[in-house]
Amino acid sequence: MVVKRSDGSYVFHFVNVVDDLEMEITHVIRGEDHLMNTPKHLQLIEAFGGKAPQYAHIPLILNQDGSKMSKRDAGAAVGDYPRQGFLPDAVVNFIALVGWNSKTDDEIFTPQELIQRFSLEGVNRAPARFDIEKCAWVNLQHIAKMDTASFAAAAKPFVEQAGLPIPENFEAIAASVKEKVRLLQEVPAAVDFLVKDEFAYDDEAVTKVKGNAQAVPLLAMLAATFSVLSEWSADAAKNALAEVAKEAGAKTGQLMFPLRVALSGRPHGPDLADILNLLGRERCVARLNRFTEILTS
């Protein structure tokens, strides 16, 4: 076995074994592509009079199409995960699931739970397929389990990087979208209409509202009713909405969608009650008036 090159440098196998022995490594877990190297390493360890670590060779991680994963493929660069807003615990959770069977229906684990459950015996023999969408789903589950303060703190840098303001009630704003986002990088787009008054309207949503002949008069009546409420709360606003619909001989549902689009510019998002509370009376009335102008222009 050649251990030293003609230029005096040592080959990988020699350096690898020396490193493991010096650091008293007890377990070496590596890809199955290193399987052919193990006999050489065992020979070197024996020659050094050292104690061999326990070797385990696990299946390679493949792309969805079955090709070998390379550093240029999606999900291969570790630095991409924090930039996209993956939580460290979620990434560890997902990587553990790639090629390992927990023997249960559970898929979401904390690092401590993984330490308690993981065993090499549970690693599958067949190569695993890497699924970045599954990783995002795991991240969503971990976000949902976070407390509000921790989520707001984690999301804040992404919102600031997007050039959006951070209002005093940002923690409450973050809480309203906590179960709506998969990645922290999605938070800015989810909260932009809550932290600033200039935002884009979804074209399809606006077209749908325009198709409702009662939308403009109903929204105008609602703005007038909101402006004279004795006190402002989501419940009071919803009661006013029901009264306006009843007075106009319409169903409450006919007003809910136009109201959401008027306040947020989009067809989906946080709970309408959260939007009403977070925006407050003045901003809600202003947005209703602005949207009725858009519908009639």
Give the positions of each predicted feature.
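Residue-level signal for inorganic ion chemistry
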Residues: 20, 41, 66, 91, ...
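Short helix-capping/linker segments at secondary-structure and domain boundaries
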Residues: 23, 99-104, 144-148, 185, ...
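Small-residue-rich helix-loop
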Residues: 148-248
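Charged substrate- and nucleic-acid-binding regions of tRNA-handling and nucleotidyl-transfer enzymes
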Residues: 235-295
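A conserved active-site cap/scaffold subdomain adjacent to cofactor or substrate pockets
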Residues: 73, 77-162
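Active-site cores that bind ATP or allylic diphosphates and position pyrophosphate for catalysis
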Residues: 1-57, 62-69, 77, 102
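Short alpha-helical scaffolding segments that buttress acidic/His motifs in well-ordered protein cores
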Residues: 95, 138-139, 174-181, 256-263, ...
